[in-house]
């Protein structure tokens, strides 16, 4: 399942974020890549634990926890603290699959990367290239969203970032360990939850709503890992 979550940051917030990122001290993005991925990764990244990355990441996670669409689709259990990257001057990241497990710096906790997320921070008109290209069961998807919008997709997906040939592309990215590790099961629960919400709005007193809601929770109880 590939999901677009719009409007997590407004224009004024994004302007302040990008202004701060322009003044930031960047490191080589290969630092957080696995052995195979490092060969394909050509970008810049704020170091893990960088104050600006923590500030942006904290604001992002706080908003996602209040976004029903994300909560329903991801069913989050653990979240790897968001990282911030920059692509410019031909920077790109060739096709790769993210490492299955991630361990935040200084933490004993490991996060299984069931879901990957990218939050676009730069106006798409301000740079050329930089599309996030995702291969899924429906073919190849090219994603280049408005600033402040986020895409959520399975961590098992082969994906890449096309070269940025003009301007610079700032983004936040992170991984989520879901309560339900299987993507097809998560998708089924997400679709069922959407149907329940729509029926609740259309026919709030229908007796089958109670049964359908019970079925949702029984499936979640069967598949969830806590």
UniProtKB/Swiss-Prot annotation:
Keyword terms, alphabetized: Dioxygenase, Iron, Metal-binding, Oxidoreductase, Vitamin C
GO biological process terms, semicolon-separated: DNA damage response; intracellular iron ion homeostasis
Protein name, as recorded: PKHD-type hydroxylase Pput_0892
Keyword Cell inner membrane (UniProt): no
Stretches assigned to coiled coil: none
Lineage: Bacteria, Pseudomonadati, Pseudomonadota, Gammaproteobacteria, Pseudomonadales
A GO term for molecular function: L-ascorbic acid binding
Binding-site residues for 2-oxoglutarate, renumbered to this chain: 169
UniProt binding sites for Fe cation: 96, 98, 159
NCBIfam families: PRK05467.1-3, PRK05467.1-4
UniProt EC number: 1.14.11.-
Domain of life (superkingdom): Bacteria
Record text on cofactor binding: Binds 1 Fe(2+) ion per subunit.
InterPro entries in the record: Oxoglu/Fe-dep_dioxygenase_dom, PKHD_C, PKHD_hydroxylase, Pro_4_hyd_alph, Pro_4_hyd_alph_FE2OG_OXY
Residue span(s) of domain Fe2OG dioxygenase: 78-178
Cofactors that this protein relies on: Fe(2+); L-ascorbate
Pfam families: 2OG-FeII_Oxy_3 (PF13640), PKHD_C (PF18331)
